Amino acid sequence: MARTDVLVFQHVAVEHPGILRDFLRADGLTWQAVELDLGEAIPDLRDFRALVVMGGPMDVWEEDLHPWLRDEKAAIREAVVERGMPVLGVCLGHQLLAEALGGEVGKASRPEVGLLEVELTEAGRRSDFLAGLPERITSLQWHGAEVKRAPEGAVVLASSPISAVQAFSVGSRALGLQFHVEITPATVGEWAVIPAYAAALEKTLGAGAVARLEREAAERMATLNRTARVFYDNFRKVTGI
């Protein structure tokens, strides 16, 4: 039986791989999403070539509220350590990847929300995961927690004034991104219906923030999507997926 190319861990329906789905389809790659927040079981990792872990409104330490987080972290650790699978973590997925591999995650000094810049570190400028990208990248941020300490052996690839670990890699198989590269024209509107996200947005950017962010994202969408394509192509090239 042929393996599915990509397994996707989702934590809320609206936080899906976004434009990355279009890239996968165009390249003829197959993918399967598992909605962990709905109680869907994690399948056998041997049936997949790669793992993508998306964002969500919960925090990595909320295992009492979301017991499935324990199994998810174990699966991420299995994918990286035992199976050497290509793994991409985005936002919450970035934090889960870090914690699963022995890093530390906690509350950020303040929420980081909006279209903001991250800066590549010296190691990031040399990394094949980030090849072809400028030293400063504008991307969508929407988080209140952060990676406080990257896993042992990880390389920090990008940072911002609020969060020092905006991106990290572990060898040539695992990549974590705190920021969102998967954004589409529908992203801001879809995420704003989640109470926790809407509250963070309004608290950080003020009343009317949803409409303003939607306009700003629309104006920059072409550039944001080109950046996503570079990330996607680099990830495929480096990991061999």
State what each model feature region is.
Residues 2-7:
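Extreme N-terminal starter segment of soluble prokaryotic enzymes
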Residues 9-11, 36, 92:
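Cofactor-binding loop segments of dinucleotide-utilizing enzymes, especially the Rossmann-like FAD-
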Residues 10-12, 53-57, 144, 179:
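Glycine-rich His-Gly loop
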Residues 14-19:
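Short N-terminal binding/cap micro-motifs at the start of the first secondary-structure element
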Residues 21-88:
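Flexible gly/pro-rich beta->alpha loop and the following alpha-helix that scaffold active-site loops
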Residues 80-104:
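Catalytic nucleophile loop
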Residues 101-186, 190:
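Pocket-forming structural segment of enzyme catalytic cores
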Residues 183-241:
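Acyltransferase
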